[in-house]
Swiss-Prot record:
Gene: APOM
Gene Ontology CC, one term: discoidal high-density lipoprotein particle
Glycosylation sites (chain numbering): N135
Family membership noted in the UniProt record: Belongs to the calycin superfamily. Lipocalin family. Highly divergent.
Role according to the record: Probably involved in lipid transport. Can bind sphingosine-1-phosphate, myristic acid, palmitic acid and stearic acid, retinol, all-trans-retinoic acid and 9-cis-retinoic acid.
Name of the protein in its database record: Apolipoprotein M
């Protein structure tokens, strides 16, 4: 009898605790514009990589040697395409250029990376002004990435990202140092 009462109390305690400390919901962005053919222009342009979160630190290891990353997202030359250019400033000062092509998936919020059929990217809004969050999944990894229009967003933005991703089972967190000047983005 004691065990049943104890189990019932723990059960109700769990319900109350869960209702008080629910993770905040994040609203998913659509990858298609109002006309169903284009990526929303508000998400095009320059972005800075601020932070990452993942279930394990190994899923973020690719960012360990990075000081900062600046991206430019532009509409592609073909419909349903996005061109992403980046310049990565490594902690040793080197600048490493990168390019990707995302393919929009009609009727879905997924972005698919050209040449990486296993990789799926989903976009989410951020409560932080000028912010956006990505969820990247691929073979053997899942990570959340925080981007902002400013290289130094308010600390509150990073804390909210960390809190949200910890609710989503991310145990590892990485904040880019952003101590060095960002590398210049090339136009090609």
């Amino acid at each position: 009898m004691f065990h049943q009462i104890w189990a019932a109390l723990l059960y109700f305690y769990g319900i109350i605790l869960n209702s008080i400390y629910q993770c905040p919901e994040h609203s998913q962005l659509t990858t298609l514009g109002v006309d169903g053919k284009e990526f929303p222009e508000v998400h095009l342009g320059q972005w800075y990589f601020i932070a990452g979160a993942a279930p394990t630190k190994e899923e973020l290891a690719t960012f360990d040697p990075v000081d900062n990353i600046v991206f430019n997202m532009a509409a592609g030359s073909a419909p349903m395409q996005l061109h992403l250019r980046a310049t990565i400033r490594m902690k040793d000062g080197l600048c490493v250029p990168r390019k990707w092509i995302y393919h929009l998936t009609e009727g879905s919020t997924d972005l698919r990376t050209e040449g990486r059929p296993d990789m799926k990217t989903e976009l989410f809004s951020s409560s932080c002004p000028g912010g956006i969050m990505l969820n990247e999944t691929g073979q053997g990894y899942q990570r959340f990435l925080l981007y902002n229009r400013s290289p130094h967003p308010p600390e509150k933005c990073v804390e909210e990202f960390k809190s949200l991703t910890s609710c989503l089972d991310s145990k590892a967190f990485l904040l880019t140092p952003r101590n060095q000047e960002a590398c210049e983005l090339s136009n090609n």
